């Protein structure tokens, strides 16, 4: 159970700035209302509830993905869904704590 929680909330040790410079897309998986209240520049809003139905579209981007949300939990779930679909994904954690290392 603890390892599952660590996996969901873990903020992958990735240089996000480098990933973005190489074309990574930031997907904010919060609800549209949360997204409207504030979000990262250039982030795309695809709520967690829609991630599974949008996998093919995301795959067509042919780019790595960084997921973010309010706390890191939903972005961790989205990361797992996308990775299981063969999309290179990292969990960026909470959008308002997202750091470009």
Which ranges hold each PLM region?
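Rhodanese-like catalytic fold shared by cysteine-dependent sulfurtransferases
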Residues: 2-16, 22, 32-64, 73-101
